[in-house]
Amino acid sequence: MYIVQIASECAPVIKAGGLGDVVYGLSRELEIRGNCVELILPKYDCMRYDHVWGLHEAYLNLWVPWFGAAIHCTVYCGWVHGRVCFFIEPHSEDNFFNRGCYYGCDDDDMRFAFFSKAALEFLHQSNKRPDIIHCHDWQTGLIPVMLYEIYKYHGMDTQRVCYTIHNFKHQGIGGVKTLWATGLNREAYYFQDDKLRDDHNPFALNYMKGGIVYSNAVTTVSPNHALEAQYTDVGCGLGHTLYLHKEKFSGVLNGIDYDFWNPEIDRHIPDNYSQDDFEQKLYNKKALRERLLLQAADKPIIAYIGRLDNQKGVHLVHHAIYHALNKGAQFVLLGSATEAGINAHFRHEKQFLNSNPDVHLELGFNEELSHLIYAGADMIVVPSNYEPCGLTQMIGLKYGTVPIVRGVGGLVNTVFDRDYDQNLPPEKRNGYVFYQSDNQALESAMNRAIDLWYQSPEQFQQLAIQGMKYDYSWNNPGTEYLNIYEWIKYKW
């Protein structure tokens, strides 16, 4: 099958968040299975060119219709860790992708409307006719709209679109100007409720809504998040639209890269280990204590790795630190905050706890240290208020670090409570789950984990090993997406 992925990110060359990892990981898995996979990306001035091999001009004269005229673009081709990537560079005074950033500009709606138009125009003019076009997030939400309303009348009538939503909070809001620019000329038609009109602002267009309405299949990043998006405010106003299109909407759990996150081969940890020689994990625990100057004591280490913000349940992260200490555990935090108030709070906590030999707060992000924490900690807490998929708990499971999570989003699909899960036998359970976003619920889950560590160390080790047996690689998501591709290829 010939598949083209169109996105605003692809790790490691363009990475602002988890989207880039997903686009790369899924593309690689699909290619390993014998499919032809190509990626189309913006050519940002600030992307990591050192990760692109053999970058060269592949298409010199791409003219993209825009506001009734046309913008000249050059399309470059290169290989990103074996993946064929095309990078679109427009030559105009707008300098759409020469801003020193990926996102955050006042005209982001127009920047990515242009990118979507240019990607389709490139496929059209170069005579590329993929079986599947897979688009990601609001930045490419207009692609299925333009494919159906414009390009299907120009020889692109057999292409099918899968549209994946990674983050409902950012939906891409434009206006009449978007229609004029892209050639979607029937203003009254597109401003209907069942087309692109935003559900909050009747004078605005919603790119993500367009992607949902016009795509052949719509996915999000976990089955439980798909339900949340339809029936709760997690959909950020798109719940009704998703419900109307529920026959083509599903959740597919993301995967993690086991070539990078794997204690058996991890080059960032002093001692590699597996479920068969789990005792080697203790050497990493010792190394973690030495590096972070924690006291050598017969205590469990509880970790938190991630952003420090409201989405991640920052109030519960703070409480987890002190509750761990009160329960005779050690605590390690590796996190960063963009909000000034949260950042100042944790800097104060770091100073206050500086002399405590059972806690270390590392503010910022350190890739190498994160690997050592996963390998050295006994438990990892993920108290998110909102978690579409979640990678932290998957990585923790692979490293035999028992997750303590709040039951939201993808956390529900990956962590199964040792004591209370009624759907799985005890040998399939792998962690601890709490549901309310309050201190008492968190404490209850932490207490159960810490008590098991102290009172039944063999059972705790068995729980950790059970978690290591789960496969959260890209293998299963790859199969699910290929099934979706086959379904839309032959159904529509």
From Swiss-Prot:
Which Pfam families does its entry note? Glyco_transf_5, Glycos_transf_1
* Gene of this entry: glgA2
Pathway linked to the protein: Glycan biosynthesis; glycogen biosynthesis
Q: What is this protein called?
A: Probable glycogen synthase 2
Q: State its Enzyme Commission number(s).
A: 2.4.1.21
Q: Where does the chain bind ADP-alpha-D-glucose?
A: K15
- Biological-process GO terms, alphabetical: glycogen biosynthetic process
Record bears the keyword Transferase: yes
State what this protein does.
Synthesizes alpha-1,4-glucan chains using ADP-glucose.
Keywords from the UniProt entry: Glycogen biosynthesis, Glycosyltransferase, Transferase
Cross-referenced PANTHER family: GLYCOGEN SYNTHASE 2-RELATED, PTHR46083
The record's Gene3D superfamilies line, in alphabetical order, gives:
Glycogen Phosphorylase B
Question: What GO annotations for molecular function exist for this entry?
Answer: alpha-1,4-glucan glucosyltransferase (ADP-glucose donor) activity; alpha-1,4-glucan glucosyltransferase (UDP-glucose donor) activity
**NCBIfam families in UniProt:** glgA (TIGR02095), PRK00654.2-1 (NF001902), PRK00654.2-4 (NF001905)
